[in-house]
Amino acid sequence: KAVALTLKRQPDCNVSYTDDAILRFNRADISMAVAVEGGLITPIIKDAGAKGLATISAEAKELAGKSRDGKLQPQEYQGGTFSISNLGMFGVSSFNSIINSPQGGILSVGAGQQRPIVKDGALSIATVMTITLAVDHRCIDGAAAAAFVKEFKGILEDPLQLML
């Protein structure tokens, strides 16, 4: 949901590169990386921006199960506009993903870890998560990528935005 909202606010990152044109999308069809026997597949949460968190969670669980069981239909894994890879659930704190062409970008999500931070001049402990964004610079420039990361960070730091 956070990526879909970010793409709505930063539409220059919801694009794909082709030999003929840069394609721009109005919907956020989010591909999620799922490990399967012998490789990886990226089923799609279609129009994720129009769905609530509970619906997205249920769809992600269902699609991951179908992926692992080898029961995905082509329309369930073809045509995504942006990808997410989450190795954080395996305790990996930081990693780089490879762009799922022709998509313009992929967000790598690392594990949340407790770290010391300084807030208002005082030392405290906070859960900190590392993300890495890889973009195809033929269709997404560095300024747009930086704006995406800034927007995504802001949404995660104010998660009530996901409820609106």
PLM features per residue range, with description:
Residues K1-L164:
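C-terminal catalytic/motor cores of large multi-domain enzyme assemblies
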